[in-house]
Amino acid sequence: MARDWQPQFERLVDEHQSMVFSLAMRMTGDRGLAEEIAQDVFLELDRSLGKIESADHACFWLRRVTMSRSTDAMRRRKVRGVNLWVEMEDHHGLGVEEQASPLGARLEELLITLPEPQRAALVLRYQEDLTPEEIAATLGAPLATVKSQLQRGLKLLRAKAATHLKEYVRGA
């Protein structure tokens, strides 16, 4: 990386490291693996910085690479069912009250059990607040596929919640 890129690279790391780590953590459920993925993503950013056209493009690029690396890691290591809140110090997108919520922790446990395409779509939709069109662009998938994955993922998550979270339902 040329010296001219150093301040820009450092700014991008400062602005987006929480988001990158959080996405990797939600996708893998493994803190160590999420840290590895985040490091790999920023090393790739270092090599690709000259191709980044704007701040919006950088954010899009980081999300896409993080999701891709997380998916690859999940396929390699076949990580399953881990409490995502354990030892998580700085969580992007949720307040402290939500992080400590037993219901939130249980939902995270259920989320990690979803098939990867559905989990990826739901994480990008509800953690990153992306539109289905933005999710399709990030994942490189057709819009119809993304909408289907969101619908199937929500349906499956609701079914799992109805079975596993009865203590949180009134009158149950």
Which residues fall in each region the model found?
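A short, charge-rich alpha-helical start-of-domain segment used by transcription regulators
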Residues: M1-S22, G32-E35, D46
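Structural recognition of an alpha-helix C-terminal capping motif at a helix-to-coil junction
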Residues: S22, E36-L43, D56-S68
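C-terminal edge and immediately downstream basic/flexible tail or linker adjoining helix-turn-helix-like DNA-binding
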Residues: A2-F9, S101, A137-T138, K155-A172
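DNA-recognition helix of helix-turn-helix
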Residues: M67, T71, L139-L165
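Sigma70-family region 2
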Residues: A2-R3, Q39-H57, R76-K78, K160
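Arg/Lys-rich amphipathic alpha helix in sigma70-family domain 2
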Residues: E53, R64-W85, A100
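Internal acidic/polar
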Residues: R80-G104, E109, T131, R170-G171
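A short pre-motif secondary-structure segment
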Residues: A121-R125
